[in-house]
Structure formats: structure tokens, C-alpha cells
């Protein structure tokens, strides 16, 4: 049963300020950039991104998919962007290692609609048992890395990343 109320992240009220954590700010930035497809393999510290897209997908007109692993999540998002959609893919920090095979070919093939990969890190071991700083992946994958310091940075950088891609 629908209440007719939009999820707060979907409300379009220019000038209205809302308090969002970083993961939700990334979702909002993707929506503002016109994301049409989102895939992910859920895992902390990135779980809220995929879970939020799962809840709002129909109302936001975003195709959403939980994938069987991070590699598949990247591959289906890449296929969506090759078809012209603006695509996002989300994963935890350790998943980036697993998804490197398809990611490493993307700079050479290029994208059509724009693609942003969100790899939520945990360099201080706050929410995960493994420490990894995935910013170093930029060097050998030949892809830019955006490293937001605040939720507002996360929203803006997600929008900017789509334009950059």
C-alpha cells in the first residue's frame, strides 16, 4: 500500500537542506546526475548505497540489480553504459580487487552513457576486518579516483564523476 510520500532522497525542493550520511549523499549525487542503472554486490561499508537504490528504483526510474559478485556488478553496469545508459556500480573496498579484470579494460573500450564505480573504503578498520586503501588502484587501472571528505563532497563528486566519465 502506497502512502504517496516520496523517499526523502527523491524530494526535489530547491534550497532545502537535508542531512545525509556519505553513502546516501552518493545516491543523491547519482540521481542528480541522471543515473539510469545501478548494480552492486552488497557489503559493509557500502551496503546503504545499494539498499537505498533497491528501495527507490521504481519511483526513481532506475534499473536496479543485486549481482552475484562484484565482477558481475561491474560487467552489467558496463554493458548498460555501452548501451547508452548512465550507470553506477557499488561495492565494498575488497570487492574492487575482485572486479579488476573487467575494470582494467574499460579505459580502453570507453563508455557511452557515463559510468561511476563506487568502492566504499575502510582504511581505519571501523566496519570491516580488512584494511585496504583502494585509492592506489587508480595508478594501474588508469582511472581517476575521487576521494570525498564530507557528505556534500560525496554528492558533488558523484555528479562531477559522471560528467568526467
Regions found by a protein language model. Name each.
Residues 1-158:
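Thiamine diphosphate
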